[in-house]
């Protein structure tokens, strides 16, 4: 008898308040790192009804025009009219940025040229064979839906849509493999005059049917489109948004553990971000090499210390070689010191705004160097697999 279960993941659009905050924080990071590669950035953003607060710590010689950066992000997301609940022109932008503590900095910038970890912590990476990008199917589908909401709003196909929105996809698995979609939930902000029946039909026809792979669609899918009724008040007018509040959306949709550290607004000396990217890089290359069908990779660091304090590979029983050997392989093939990660993934680039919506992983963009599978042959050689 086949073992059957349901698994659910969610995504949010770029106009969700938490994602607005993430994008502003990463836009600040991009502005600074483009001009000062030695900068240390920890930028946190709050958006609420009619205002935005940018706070955190910097160590840089660059002046960053915070108001201009924040307003440009909000404009590009689509909050261009007060009727949407937030307007890039009239929103107040408050700057509470301070200087990085020298106590932290002394452990990061070392005299020997190495970089100490910016904090202690544990990070996870994951890969599996459920999608071509080696991501879990539920989160991959959820991101495609929220991307679809934004695309159809911006290109005018569904002009009644507004920037705020969410998706959630429940997938049925049999014997550990995805076989069909069970439930789709979409909540999207819309114009006041929009009829709910029209909105539901349009979202299913223009987004679900055109975005999701036909192999997973069936006549028995349960659809919940704006299940509470109208969704006119949205964005920061409806809910406050904060940087780092969507860490499961940002990663694997709950398919693997999470160390708890957020990404956005942090320069790559912060291992919360860079080591999580490296762990994905490791996991994806392990699965792509064929040595396993799934890989969870954990790395952990101590503040100011160069080498990781632990590295773990868990293939959940799918490995063709022992997990302990794969752990040794990772140590031999990959550079997992903060400096090694930054150099091997070329992380001192203004690439981070793009990561701040629709997932940091599983998107084949040129900027996303951690999605490369250029270590496959080295892994095969180490493991003796042809």
UniProtKB/Swiss-Prot annotation:
GO terms for biological process: one-carbon metabolic process; S-adenosylmethionine biosynthetic process. ATP binds at residues 16, 164-166, 230-231, 239, 245-246, 262, 266. Pathway: Amino-acid biosynthesis; S-adenosyl-L-methionine biosynthesis; S-adenosyl-L-methionine from L-methionine: step 1/1. Its main location: cytoplasm. L-methionine binds at residues 57, 100, 239, 270. Its EC number is 2.5.1.6. Its cofactor is Mg(2+); K(+). Binds 2 divalent ions per subunit. Binds 1 potassium ion per subunit. This is S-adenosylmethionine synthase. It comes from Helicobacter hepaticus (strain ATCC 51449 / 3B1). The gene is metK.
